[in-house]
Amino acid sequence: MTTKKRPVGKKKFVSFSDDDALSRTGRLPKNLPQHGSPPVYVRRTWQTIPFHLIVLSYWFIKHSNGYDVRKCTWLLVPCQVLYLALQFNPATVYGNKILKLNYALLAVSGVTCILLTIPCMLLVVLFGAPFLEMLDKTWLLSLHCCVLSYPAVYSVLNSDFKVGFFKKYFISIAVGCWISCLAIPLDWDRPWQEWPIPLVVGAQLGAMFGYTFCSQL
């Protein structure tokens, strides 16, 4: 007696995960790297271009009253939060998932950025920044740089401190500051040469480059 073989169908899997993440399967473009890519990375897309930094830099250079770094930093804070929520986080892939925005982590990342102003300020002073004479302005520069790095800080915390990929964003901001220092000693006696105005602009330009092109590197 011959026995009939049952047709082998596709196995069905049921997931009981309570993770609020969105799976990449069927939700992301097929041209994403599947092999050899880091466990956490940012997709190559125009979505990560920080258009708000272009507008803010133009306002700071052309229309701000006396190059007000304090006001520029306060304007930057909500812009960076919206940029993270609407542009950077949706383009960031954690393993095989895009995680929804973690509101508690937004606050934690903000506090982390404030705490990072202290080592950032010490680093700026070690590179030759005025310390006692313009301590408030040096701290404002450090705060501005840390706010610029806010999306990268959030992503590092959200990926269990996988700093390897996101360090490029911090480096681009630091390099922008470093290059812009060349404008200060020039004998032009212009208002925009005062500390720390050139470095604020340089940090913004470095952040523009980083958030636009670091996903390609």
UniProtKB/Swiss-Prot annotation:
Pfam families: PIG-F (PF06699)
Localization: Endoplasmic reticulum membrane
Bilayer topology annotation: Multi-pass membrane protein
Gene: GPI11
Name this polypeptide is given: Glycosylphosphatidylinositol anchor biosynthesis protein 11
Organism per entry: Eremothecium gossypii (strain ATCC 10895 / CBS 109.51 / FGSC 9923 / NRRL Y-1056) (Yeast)
Pathway(s): Glycolipid biosynthesis; glycosylphosphatidylinositol-anchor biosynthesis
GO molecular function: mannose-ethanolamine phosphotransferase activity
TM regions (residue ranges): 45-61, 74-94, 111-131, 138-158, 169-189, 195-215
Chief place where the protein resides: endoplasmic reticulum
Keywords, alphabetical: Endoplasmic reticulum, GPI-anchor biosynthesis, Membrane, Transmembrane, Transmembrane helix
Main function: Acts in the GPI biosynthetic pathway between GlcNAc-PI synthesis and GPI transfer to protein.
Residues of the signal peptide: none
Gene Ontology cellular component list: endoplasmic reticulum membrane
Superkingdom of the source species: Eukaryota
